[in-house]
Every structure is written in C-alpha cells, then in structure tokens.
Amino acid sequence: LECHNQQSSQAPTTKTCSGETNCYKKWWSDHRGTIIERGCGCPKVKPGVKLNCCRTDRCNN
C-alpha cells in the first residue's frame, strides 16, 4: 500500500506501508489554521479531530 505522508499543504510525498491495509488523513484547526496530517494505518483520534481512513494507494491526499 502506498500512502501520502506530507503535512498540511506541503508538496505531495508518499511512502510505502508494508503490512498496512489503510492510509489516513486527519485534520484539525488551531491558531495556525487547519493542520493536516497523513500517513499509514488508521489511528485513534481525540475528540475534535476529523479522520478519514481509506484502503487504496494514495487515497489520502
């Protein structure tokens, strides 16, 4: 599985996630604006953090 792993609005980068079946994108707002984090897996998130998990290559941009 190949997942995006760039932060927020940086140029897209990807990494190969061996053994993973999900990519994730999570985002939240703070004083800097909207922060976006991407990576492998499907983490648990705190209340107020939005999460999208998906199961195809590069689906989490």
Swiss-Prot record:
CDD domains reported for this sequence: TFP_snake_toxin (cd00206)
The species this protein was found in: Naja philippinensis (Philippine cobra)
Disulfide bonds: C3-C23, C17-C40, C42-C53, C54-C59
The family this protein is said to belong to: Belongs to the three-finger toxin family. Short-chain subfamily. Type I alpha-neurotoxin sub-subfamily.
GO molecular function, one term: toxin activity
Keyword Nucleus (UniProt): no
Protein name, entry field: Short neurotoxin 1
Record function comment: Binds to muscle nicotinic acetylcholine receptor (nAChR) and inhibit acetylcholine from binding to the receptor, thereby impairing neuromuscular transmission.
Entry comment describing in which tissues the protein is expressed: Expressed by the venom gland.
Keywords: Acetylcholine receptor inhibiting toxin, Disulfide bond, Ion channel impairing toxin, Neurotoxin, Postsynaptic neurotoxin, Secreted, Toxin
Lineage: superkingdom: Eukaryota
Main location: secreted
Residue ranges of the TM segments: none
One Pfam family cited in the UniProt record for this chain: Toxin_cobra-type
